[in-house]
Curated annotation (Swiss-Prot):
Any matching Pfam family: IL2RB_N1
Species this protein is from: Macaca fascicularis
Annotated motif Box 1 motif, positions: 278-286
Protein's name according to its UniProt entry: Interleukin-2 receptor subunit beta
Gene3D superfamilies noted in UniProt: Immunoglobulins
A GO cellular-component term linked to this record: cell surface
Function: Receptor for interleukin-2. This beta subunit is involved in receptor mediated endocytosis and transduces the mitogenic signals of IL2. Probably in association with IL15RA, involved in the stimulation of neutrophil phagocytosis by IL15.
Transmembrane segments: 241-265
Membrane topology term: Single-pass type I membrane protein
Disulfide bonds listed in the record: 36-46, 74-86
Location of the protein in the cell: Cell membrane; Cell surface
GO terms, molecular function: interleukin-15 receptor activity; interleukin-2 binding; interleukin-2 receptor activity
Oligomer status and interactors: Non-covalent dimer of an alpha and a beta subunit. IL2R exists in 3 different forms: a high affinity dimer, an intermediate affinity monomer (beta subunit), and a low affinity monomer (alpha subunit). The high and intermediate affinity forms also associate with a gamma subunit. Interacts with SHB upon interleukin stimulation.
UniProt keyword annotations, A-Z: Cell membrane, Disulfide bond, Glycoprotein, Membrane, Receptor, Signal, Transmembrane, Transmembrane helix
Length: 551
């Protein structure tokens, strides 16, 4: 019977053995949690928790860095019924063993009989999982009845983030627990704190912790050891709550200011009353400025205004005449001059006054003209008055009817430098000598060397072939020279008061304009003058040419 019983139980035991083995394995490989932190120097602290209890089993944590040649192992020690912890010591406390580029492989190995079984594994990044050591050296710096200054130090913190830290502190008052204590946060590296609103002669406890701002999984350090301190007792006769007195004074001042503003706004007689209250010595200006009161009745605006009417500031005389300056094309000059010549001239005045003017401003027209030099243009304005030359009347039997004016005196060499007349075919607004060079000086009147000027065909048709200009007579004493000059690109002939006899039959006529005989007056051209080659004629040069007539 016993043999039959054993044979029957043996298959049953074989069937139950795998179930028992699987249940034991599940206890060992139950749900676990493996967490490690780096203190930024030479310590890695790990905590491993297992749901199923392990009996008589030793476990270790092994560390293998990927960039280092060392490896470390620590023994897991039980801290509770289902959790174990250990510290991997990598070197001296203040040595920097790991950096941000290091990765450490951490494994939890548990012993099963004669062999080791891996329970957990993790690729650990030190500077992503930071937890510093708790602050140390807490001490009371200064204590009063309502406040207390406390300082501390941090230990084993890496220089990589020593300036990027934050702190949390809490104070335990009597009758409360640490969990009920309010937290005070310091968002900068500040290794001290001033506790206020404390109760006099009361016992307190203080704790602080630190956390770096770097790292994704960084957490707070453990709380420091509590620091116990006691505030000073309050002196007799003094207010135990000083801030209450300051609050009352501030509120009283605010309400008083509001009431004062309200009264000043709503009171009708505020002006005189305020002047009496805020009366200050203001000097009377009438004592120093008698005219202010006597003439202007105290009106400062009239006193400061000008004593002359505004109309006195406007110019009383007529505005000076501004000579117009025109720029004409080359082919239009001859037509305009011919049209001007066709206009009938007024009869000669009985006073025998002749008006002459001569202007040149060749350089002003050098801007964008055909065949002209390119220089910078400028605006030039001159005022001038016509030159009046009064000539004495000549009576007698030899004087012809009509009282012809006296002949003009020839211009000097200095006058020739600024009063020029171009050739008939080249009636430009400036001297043609600028392009071709100066012409040779003219010889004596009537000589064979005198240059002859050809008229345009339109002018030659109007001039008789048997007319010839008479040479200019000697200068008449007492005849004034030109008074005012204005640079103007026109060619103006001087009117000469000289009776002209009948010209010779074969001598060519050299005047561009001529008046037929019988009218009693002939427009004569000045002698051939040297051409001006200067771009501008300054005012000083004009005065130098005739010092007796200043412009």
């Amino acid at each position: 019977m016993a043999t039959l019983a054993l044979s029957w139980c043996l298959p049953l035991l074989i069937l139950l053995l795998p179930l028992a083995t699987s249940s034991a394995s599940a206890a060992v490989n139950g749900t676990s949690r493996f967490t490690c932190f780096y203190n930024s120097r030479a310590n890695i602290s790990c905590v491993w928790s297992q749901d199923g209890a392990l009996q008589d089993t030793s476990c270790q944590v092994h560390a293998w860095p990927d960039r280092r040649r060392w490896n470390q192992t620590c023994e897991l020690l039980p801290v509770s019924q289902a959790s174990w912890a250990c510290n991997l010591i990598l070197g001296t406390p203040d040595s920097q063993k790991l950096t941000a580029v290091d990765i450490v492989t951490l494994r939890v190995m548990c012993r099963e009989g004669v062999r080791w079984r891996m329970m957990a594994i993790q690729d650990f990044k030190p500077f992503e999982n930071l937890r510093l050591m708790a602050p140390i050296s807490l001490q009371v710096v200064h204590v009063e009845t309502h406040r207390c200054n406390i300082s501390w130090k941090i230990s084993q913190a890496s220089h990589y983030f020593e300036r990027h830290l934050e702190f949390e502190a809490r104070t335990l008052s009597p009758g409360h627990t640490w969990e009920e204590a309010p937290l005070m946060t310091l968002k900068q590296k500040q290794e001290w704190i001033c506790l206020e609103t404390l109760t006099p002669d009361t016992q307190y406890e203080f704790q602080v912790r630190v956390k770096p701002l770097q790292g994704e999984f960084t957490t707070w350090s453990p709380w420091s050891q509590p620091l116990a301190f006691r505030t000073k007792p309050a002196a007799l006769g003094k207010d135990t709550i000083p801030w209450l007195g300051h609050l009352l004074v501030g509120l009283s001042g605010a309400f008083g200011f509001i009431i004062l503003v309200y009264l000043l706004i709503n009171c009708r007689n505020t002006g005189p009353w305020l002047k009496k209250v805020l009366k200050c010595h203001t000097p009377d200006p009438s004592k120093f400025f008698s005219q202010l009161t006597s003439e202007h009745g105290g009106d400062v605006q009239k006193w400061l205004s000008s004593p002359f009417p505004s109309s006195s500031f406007s110019p009383g005389g007529l505005a000076p005449e501004i000579s117009p300056l025109e720029v004409l094309e080359r082919d239009k000059v001859t037509q305009l001059l011919l049209q001007q010549d066709k206009v009938p001239e007024p009869s000669s005045l009985s006073s025998n006054r002749s008006l002459t003017s001569c202007f040149t401003n060749q350089g002003y027209f050098f801007f964008h003209l055909p065949d002209a030099l390119e220089i910078e243009a400028c605006q030039v304005y001159f005022t001038y008055d016509p030159c009046a030359e009064e000539e004495p009347d000549e009576g007698g039997a030899d004087a012809p009817t009509g009282s012809s004016p006296q002949p003009l005196r020839p211009l000097s060499a200095e006058d020739d430098a600024y009063c020029t007349f171009p050739s008939g075919d080249d009636l430009l607004l400036f001297s043609p000598s600028l392009l071709g060079g100066p012409s040779p000086p003219s010889t004596a009147p009537g000589g064979s060397g005198a240059g002859e000027e050809r008229l345009p065909p339109s002018l030659q048709e109007r001039v008789p072939r048997d007319w010839d200009p008479q040479p200019l007579g000697p200068p008449t004493p007492g005849v004034p020279d030109l008074v005012d000059f204005q640079p103007r690109p026109e060619l103006v002939l001087r009117e000469a008061g000289e009776q002209v006899p009948d010209p010779g039959p074969r001598e060519p006529f050299s005047f561009p304009w001529a008046r037929p005989p019988g009218q009693g007056e002939v427009r004569a051209l000045n002698a051939r003058l040297p051409l001006n080659t200067d771009a501008y004629l300054s005012l000083q040069e004009l005065q130098d040419q005739d010092p007796t007539h200043l412009v």
